[in-house]
């Protein structure tokens, strides 16, 4: 009960420092990123003599600029340096606007460190590695983490997944000081995420998630799902949360999200990296899934909020983007503006805004994922726009508690999470679903039934399979596939053998494979489709559907296969 009170209150509401040689003072003009927006200027604050392969940035309550140096992200055999990531305090000791000294704030068993953030009230420094959130303190303000107050495993991701930048990242804090963070798709590997007081949640293959916990990591809860990799997460005053989604696969653009509690943003790794499977939605195409707020440049990393606008670092497109937010009653609209565009080696990763109005931006420099010995921190001025008003916290109430009697809850996808929760238990009655004449409303009632009873003890998913609307049939198949509902196998196999449409054939053969414990990522499911197409006893309808949804025919069908199809005389084929 205590954790729920904390959570819904949110919804409503040591190493030795060493000096280094001074950094070079000159920066070749042709290598500097170019300001695009009026009034913006940028200069290099620190170069690779002070920072290499930087990821996260943060400014402490005392004004110290902390920067993460990665020494572990695809480390080559000949890389020189310590075998742990390092957090440096970067200083401008002579006040000329260019950093000239660094010292070690913390370095001890840091692997694939992605982010660093300062708690708004306590001043504690939170660090996100791929698998762990650590809390550090500097109570005596000496620029070195207090060795007796290092809190490891505030949150821990227990998994065999080890790709460096699709685990924990995106640290931020809500208005009450609670912790919010992202976890990437983890390449679909099984995981258990462990919070304070031994809270454990396990899953696999569902894609990236955004999580909420109290400041000490306790009361861990999933806040939203359906991301690829919410690498950057930011909280704006009033309880509004935004995130970057780092990778669009074959469905560009990358996504910028307004993150709503309980929202499903459509992606699931188990159905393939391409993002083309009918069970995947990228922009709210399926009922119950959330549309993106806007597209971003490729490989968006950190996100920062200031004065009613969002700032995004696009690593691959080498630019800093700004998005002014306009409230429309149930969410936001926005347009993209380019502030800074890089030429050549400019790969922005993370931001930190200082009290003097400067924006610091870490720069990985090269496109290489392997460590390469280069790095920079840039200082941007003139970047903050005039204040754009944000709505009060009360404006989010319709996003949390629905009124099903209002039509807007049935038509605006951003209100779907609240509606699905509100319908809840009532829609476990199959009669209520059948009685709904509007197909879209019927689909949302089906999703409410799933939310109330995921294991489908009432057998409602098979009622969805028998519906006349293809979207409802698709949602029923997805429910069965996601949860691997064995009791629905016969009904799913019947649809495979008599598919209403090619799209539903693909969905049904995927669900059948999932029930049988098979993997269904892109090439695996394509192989199953090819096998059905070659079956001589398969009906014309099945073979025609299989042929239409077989994406890589040249890889799955030989010349002999095509000749047999042609010589069969089957007019449907």
How does the language model describe each region?
Residues 5-15:
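Bacterial N-terminal signal peptides
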Residues 19-403:
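Beta-propeller domains with acidic blade repeats across secreted/periplasmic ectodomains
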Residues 43, 88, 103, 208-211, ...:
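Solvent-exposed, polar/charged alpha-helical surfaces in well-ordered, non-transmembrane soluble domains
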Residues 354, 358, 408-413, 417:
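Gly/Ser/Thr/Pro-enriched helix-cap/hinge segments flanking short amphipathic alpha-helices
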Residues 392-402, 413-426, 440-455, 459-463, ...:
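Structural detector for internal amphipathic alpha-helices that build alpha-solenoid repeat scaffolds
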Residues 406-411, 431-437, 448, 460-468, ...:
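Alpha-solenoid HEAT/Armadillo-like helical repeat scaffolds in large eukaryotic proteins
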Residues 457-458, 489, 522-526, 559:
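Core helices of alpha-solenoid repeat scaffolds
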